[in-house]
């Protein structure tokens, strides 16, 4: 997933921070900032919000299987990360004046990290074997696009940053990998069919199977709590004009992410159903612990002609019961529930002093 693409639709988030010391011990007990600063009055499902990062662009923080750690990606010049790299933190640490442990190579660009079973290794995608430098951003034009870097491959690594295994090794884009709750399967997005489709594989990279086969950018997939279903977002162009534009952009390794809806299917791709029909960009879905609802990011409620506003929403799998969860005026996204369902981690532009920084926050979840 192109992490900061949709943030860029509403505001450029390339932030800058003061240089921090290389202290990977962190600060136990995240710095307390008043609840009034971190929470909006209408955020009734969130309690005791705590800020974990304090500068740069931090996103896609995902819990370890035991719920004690988070792995996330960040772009932060103060951390010597000019483009996204992968870091790990304990949930009771914060990183205001120090730098978290780097667990990617520090080369190329990375995306979409996730813990593997046992919590001593992670999975993530990286371009470092294709080029150790940050890949170029796409040119800014009349339309907003995400790059689909063909150098992205999927790797496993230990928490010291050592590559253990390369799980994919073929021409084209392989990224956006997440792991099933039982730890036996991986779902990811690939262009190996000529389109951006979902695939599954065993935890060791074997038995790769195609899941989706309709034209469009299928990505950002997660398993349901019982591991039987996949939830994901897709662009799914329909009209002749939309199809042509999608294919033309994909031929340039680009996609336009401004119109996406959410879908659910069985792990083998059967029983595919569309969950949302809200228009605009609906993405970053994650299952509620009950397995009957999903939390996701959307800008469908933005005022026409105004700046897009991205917030978290909850919806039933059948598309009913839409409820707004967060209310930042610019950006809330990348939600994930802890394995026991008691906490929610997410990224937000709140409490950034009017800068373009996106930080990580963790909160107690209140039903």
Locations of regions flagged by a protein language model:
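Sec-dependent signal peptide recognition
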Residues: 2-8
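C-terminal motif of bacterial Sec signal peptides marking the signal peptidase cleavage site
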Residues: 14-15
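Sequence/structural signature of beta-propeller modules
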Residues: 22-40
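Multi-bladed beta-propeller domains
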Residues: 34-57, 89-109, 157-173, 203-217, ...
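A flexible loop/linker signature enriched in serine peptidases of the S9 family
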Residues: 54-57, 74-86, 104-110, 125-153, ...
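Residue-level detector of Asp-centered blade-edge/turn motifs that repeat once per structural unit
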Residues: 65-66, 117-118, 181-182, 225-226, ...
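Hydrophobic beta-strand positions that form the internal "hydrophobic ladder"
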Residues: 70-71, 122, 186-187, 230, ...
């Amino acid at each position: 997933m192109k992490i900061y693409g949709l943030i860029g639709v509403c505001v450029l988030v390339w932030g800058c921070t003061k240089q921090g010391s290389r202290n990977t011990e962190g600060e136990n007990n995240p710095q307390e900032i008043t609840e009034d600063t971190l929470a909006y009055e209408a955020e009734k499902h969130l309690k005791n919000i705590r800020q974990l990062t304090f500068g740069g662009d931090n996103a896609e923080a995902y819990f370890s299987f035991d719920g004690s750690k988070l792995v996330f990606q960040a772009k932060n010049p103060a951390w010597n990360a000019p483009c996204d790299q992968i870091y790990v933190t304990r949930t009771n640490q914060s990183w205001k004046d120090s730098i978290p442990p780097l667990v990617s190579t520090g080369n190329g660009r990375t995306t979409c990290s996730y813990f593997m079973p046992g919590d001593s290794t992670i999975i993530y995608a990286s371009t470092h074997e294709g080029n150790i430098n940050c890949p170029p951003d796409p040119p800014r034009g009349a339309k907003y696009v995400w790059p689909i870097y063909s150098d992205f491959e999927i790797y496993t690594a230990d928490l010291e940053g050592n590559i253990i295994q390369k799980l994919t090794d073929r021409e084209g884009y392989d990224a956006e990998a997440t792991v099933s709750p039982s730890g036996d399967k991986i779902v990811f997005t690939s262009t190996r069919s000529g389109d951006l489709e979902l695939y599954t594989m065993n935890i060791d990279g074997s038995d790769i199977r195609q899941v989706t086969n309709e034209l469009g950018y299928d990505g950002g997939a997660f398993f349901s709590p019982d591991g039987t279903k996949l939830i994901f977002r897709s662009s799914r162009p329909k009209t002749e004009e939309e199809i042509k534009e999608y294919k033309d952009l994909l031929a340039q390794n680009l996609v336009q992410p401004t119109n996406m809806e959410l879908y659910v299917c069985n792990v083998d791709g059967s029983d595919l159903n569309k969950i949302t029909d809200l228009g605009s960009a609906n993405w970053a879905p994650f299952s509620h612990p009950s397995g009957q609802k999903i939390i996701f990011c959307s800008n469908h409620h933005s005022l026409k002609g105004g700046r897009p506003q991205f917030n978290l929403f909850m919806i039933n799998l059948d598309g009913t019961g839409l409820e707004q969860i967060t209310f930042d005026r610019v950006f809330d996204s990348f939600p994930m529930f802890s394995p026991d369902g008691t906490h929610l981690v997410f990224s937000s532009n709140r409490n950034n002093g009017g800068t373009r920084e996106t930080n990580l926050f963790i909160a107690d979840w209140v039903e």
